[in-house]
Amino acid sequence: MDLMQHLYGTGLEVVLVSPRRFQEAQRAVLAVREQKFVVLQAQQMEPDLAQRTIDFVAGGVQAIDGQAERLDATTFLFAPALVRLSHMQPKSIDPPD
């Protein structure tokens, strides 16, 4: 079976995780392991605890060959290994001649 057919055939899922405690971070890693995308929002946490949580999830996702992308100071996107995250740079607009 073609990998792309497999991905599209099963449907992709995005899980939004807004932990209030460090113990909730494991849910994010488990979701990525289940081939789901995770958006982790740590705004509701104290800064030190938020950093610890983000580091834990990023390490867990990296251990299963997933990817991480910072969206803003406290929001991250985590993707499973089968998906490649890429950046689309805006095209520069040339001034009129």
Predicted regions and their residues:
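Positively charged, small/polar-rich N-terminal and surface patches that mediate targeting and assembly
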Residues: 1-46, 51, 55-97
